[in-house]
Amino acid sequence: MINRATFVFTFSIFLAFTQLTFAQSKDVSSTLEVYKITTNQQGEETAEEVTTITRGDTLEYQVTYTNNLPNSISNLQPVLPIPTGIEYMANTAEPEINTASLSPSGSNFQQLPIMREETTESGLATENEVPAREYRRLRWSVPSLDSQNSVTVTARVQVIQANR
């Protein structure tokens, strides 16, 4: 189980990396919010502030990017790192992501679906889709963002390791 202070510190670091990915100044600001998603007795999803996380928890990242410039910007490409111990849950990104990376650093984003060649037990080479849980960074494409406007991107992840 991770306590709130450790969790907030860890995700603050990832938010800093996210901001550095596409903006080195205050031209675009970002705010990260993380919610634990649970289902109540009526089967309805609820989002609650994260205080602790445990293995198996579903979290939703909500990152809001704001254009602080006096004019619109184009081709904004927000990036969300997926920390170690966390797995991206397929098809939960809003708006839909168009590229992802299997590496926690660098700029090697690939169009989805990401494919890789694998060798079967009989020695045949096959091309298989990489499971979304292996994605280490997600990237969105925002064609334009008007001055003083914001866009929010979201993605859900599952905690697979919380014993830090």
Descriptions of predicted regions:
Residues 1-9:
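Bacterial N-terminal signal peptides that target proteins for export
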Residues 2-3, 22-164:
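Exported/extracytosolic protein signature
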Residues 8-18:
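Bacterial N-terminal signal peptides
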